Structure formats: structure tokens, C-alpha cells
Regions:
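Cytosolic regulatory regions built on CNB/CRP/Popeye-like sensor folds
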Residues: 1-159
């Protein structure tokens, strides 16, 4: 998948997909996405591969350009896993560690082959200094994703 294809994955996200946890940035076209994605690095993955290990100390945001991933936590028995969410192209992973600098809180493995775009915190800082309005837009889009995920978790806990 080329950089032009990656841009189209994210630029196609529409505001009416409001219930989904994908990144939605109204007003962002290909030019805005190219400015952000210039600060990322592609990382292909294969089905069943662990792409994020719980406890890993890194501060990178993952943009899902293609594929399907599952987020889960290990149970007290240390063997069984509980699935928390499935994440598809157009969304993000690793946002908690990206924001707070703490170790990864869950495991993430690939359900299907795909590509992640890695955005290290330092690269985002450079982007933010060069494009503060775009960085603000992106942070609000990330906050929307976090809000949807928290709302979904609250709903599951009430059941």
C-alpha cells in the first residue's frame, strides 16, 4: 500500500460515521493528511502477529491504514484473554500511552494482514510546531475516539 492509498483511507472518513471509533476530521483533505502522514513510518503486519505487547514502554500512536486488529487483556490465570475491541482501518491504537507516557495497557494482535502507520510522540511534536491548527484538529479527533471507546466500555459494564 502506498502513501497515496494511506491518505485515502483516512481522508474518506465522514462525519456521519459518528458512532464508529474511526478518525473523523471534517475539512481535512489529502493535503492535510499528507502533512501528518509525512511524520509516520509504515509497519506491515500479518494475521495472528502480536503488534502491541502489554507492558511495553513506548510512546507511539498507531494509525490503522489497513487490516483488522483485536485488543485484549490477559486474565488473572495468565493464560486466557478477554477481547476488549476490534479495530479496523481508519482508526487508531496506542493512544493511552501516547498521551500519558505509561506502559501499554493491553495486547493487540492482528486478525487480518494489514499496515500500521507509526507516529512517535516526538514526530507529532514536530508536526504540532509546524502545523498547530492541524495538530489541534487531530487531537480533537483522537479525543472523540477516546470518548466513543469510553462510552462503549461504560455500556458493556452496565450490562
Amino acid at each position: 500500500m502506498t502513501e497515496a492509498n494511506w491518505v485515502s483511507v483516512f481522508a474518506r472518513n465522514e462525519p456521519e460515521q459518528h458512532a464508529s471509533d474511526i478518525l473523523v476530521l471534517p475539512g481535512w483533505g489529502e493535503a492535510e493528511w499528507q502533512k501528518l502522514l509525512a511524520h509516520t513510518m509504515p509497519r506491515p503486519f500479518r494475521a495472528s502477529e502480536v503488534v502491541i505487547q502489554r507492558g511495553a514502554a513506548e510512546r507511539t500512536l498507531y494509525l490503522v491504514a489497513a487490516g483488522l486488529l483485536e485488543v485484549g487483556v490477559t486474565q488473572v490465570d495468565g493464560v486466557s484473554m478477554t477481547s476488549l475491541a476490534r479495530i479496523s482501518s481508519g482508526s487508531i491504537l496506542g493512544e493511552q500511552s501516547f498521551f500519558d507516557g505509561q506502559p501499554r495497557s493491553a495486547n493487540v494482535w492482528a486478525v487480518a494482514d494489514g499496515t500500521l502507520l507509526l507516529l512517535p510522540y516526538d514526530n507529532f511534536t514536530v508536526f504540532g510546531e509546524a502545523e498547530p491548527a492541524l495538530a489541534r484538529d487531530f487531537l480533537f479527533a483522537m479525543a472523540r475516539v477516546l470518548s466513543i471507546r469510553l462510552r462503549n466500555t461504560s455500556f458493556r459494564l452496565r450490562r
